[in-house]
Amino acid sequence: MLPPGADTVVVRHGDVGVKSSHVQSDMERTLRENLAAMLADRTVPGDVDREWGRILVRTPEPDRAADAAADTFGVVSASPAASVSPDLDAITDALADAAEEQYHEGAFAVDARRAGSHDFDSRDVNRAGGDAVWAAVEDDFEPEVDLDDPDLTFSVEVRDEEAFVFLETRDGPGGMPLGTQKPLVALLSGGIDSPVAAWQAMKRGAPVVPLYLDLGDYGGPDHLARAEESVRKLDAYAPNRDLDLRVAPAGDAVGRLAESVGRTRMLSYRRFMYRVAEHVAESVGAVGVVTGEAVGQKSSQTTANLGVVDRATQLPVHRPLLTWDKQDIVQAARDIGTYRDSTIEVGCNRLAPSQPLTAAPIESVRKDEPDALFEWAREAAAAVESTEVTLA
């Protein structure tokens, strides 16, 4: 819902504002660059500036620009607004115009916030603005005022040299601007969890290098396509970064594990997987690995077994979904657009033993797994191919 004359998007950021002044300046610059890239990626005209303590997008298409801002990491919220002179008459005129165009029924409220030096305060804006809205609609409707639960809120932000009138605020993802942290290798399985974990890492500012292990006969025929689709969806949140999917051949190693390892087979596979990711991370300058594992979701993801697989790599393994319930992961996947049919069998289930250990001693795992396991991982990483994933 846009006010008449909307020409600006007021962008608010969260965690950026709690940093030291130097760090905040760097993060705001990165956020502005990411916003500009997001606008360009969606062919939305606009200029991104920092004025009056806010990041502002000046644009002839505020509706589309607000949507773009609301998909940018580091943005808490975005409001398409009309910019007016910061005097009471201009503000009340803009509120009256907005009421005439957008008010149709129900209760309304005026919510003003002010910063800077003016000859009025926020309460003056609320009173005068409320009167202006009422006068604009009382002949055609039966308006009501409800400050606690209005059907429509007329919002005003007043700054030293400008005021903004807006009727809605769109939530952004929050977090940190993408690129303010070092990159991580994101292990993607083609399932639901791993893209959500990658998205969460991106939300905290870490670019991701997507890595998919091709399980050969042990993987479903559509798993690579599902991983590619996940990367395509993630790429929409990172317009100034190339999220090419790297594919490591793992079919031979998995086949050997299936033939030679019993109840600890899945742990050895995950140790192999982590070591492949470590080699890829070294080659691309990533500083860690991010996975979609959650405590207790599978036998290999108990607190004891996670400790066993962690010992296969010297890199930190980040698990954003560690304590999430499955239904929350599914909902997050739907929200960010990476959800795929959860009833489709995940290929590595065929690798799982019938009676896996839930607390395998590291000594037993090492004893049972092939001596050449980590050499296979090195070979798989050396054979990685990069697949360019383009937006549909």
Regions flagged by a language model, labelled:
Residues 9-10, 34, 140-144, 150-186, ...:
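Nucleotide-activated chemistry modules centered on ATP-dependent adenylation/adenylyltransferase
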Residues 61, 191-192:
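Short beta->alpha connector loops
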Residues 1-185, 199-219, 224-226, 230-241:
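RNA-binding accessory domains that recognize and position tRNA/RNA substrates
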